[in-house]
């Protein structure tokens, strides 16, 4: 997507100005090599603390890199390993801190009604982590808006909607090929 860039495989301890550009394919091949190593050596998702990538996240990214390298069978194999991982599953039941959430509603008549569904649970602040029961998430950002310093403490005053701020800006990307 971005064209040529250097591949640096050794730690740089002093200023360097003689970098050699690598092609996109060389970069993707290095990513593949690194991710194959990661799949082998990173912890299983159930043995990893929240917010840290596991071998499931490495497999997911590897499947995308293999698509870029036009190795579609390899991509299917890696994606299938993620899908069939016994620790992963699509959420089909309410979970987390808000599974029993009730809402009085705008026309409150004295009885609270259950509110939300599984999809709603997936994206609620402080509710989407594996520790909360979310087995669908491959890797997520850890933050807690109810904890002092646990969310956005920038100049905007601490309104942390991170899960709504990031996303693919596909309309602004240009393929160089």
What residue spans do the PLM features occupy?
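Aromatic-anchored glycine-rich loop motif in surface-exposed flexible loops
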Residues: 1-54, 69-89
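An aromatic- and glycine-enriched ligand-binding surface/loop that stacks and positions planar moieties
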Residues: 36, 56, 62, 66-177
């Amino acid at each position: 997507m971005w064209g040529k860039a250097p591949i640096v495989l050794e730690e740089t301890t002093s200023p360097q100005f003689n970098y050699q550009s690598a092609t996109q394919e060389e970069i993707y091949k290095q990513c593949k090599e690194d991710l194959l190593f990661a799949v082998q050596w990173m912890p299983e998702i159930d043995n990893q603390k929240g917010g840290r990538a596991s071998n499931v996240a490495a497999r997911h990214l590897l499947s995308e890199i293999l698509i870029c390298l036009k190795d579609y069978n390899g991509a299917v194999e890696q994606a299938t390993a993620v899908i069939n991982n016994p620790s992963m599953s699509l959420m089909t039941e309410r979970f987390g801190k808000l599974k029993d959430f009730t809402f009085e509603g705008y026309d409150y008549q004295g009885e609270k009604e259950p509110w939300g569904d599984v999809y709603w649970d997936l994206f609620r602040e402080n509710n989407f982590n594996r520790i909360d029961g979310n087995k669908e998430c491959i890797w997520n950002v850890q933050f807690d808006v109810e904890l002092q310093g646990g969310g956005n403490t920038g100049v905007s005053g601490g309104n942390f909607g991170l899960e709504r701020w990031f996303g693919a800006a596909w309309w602004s990307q240009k393929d160089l090929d």
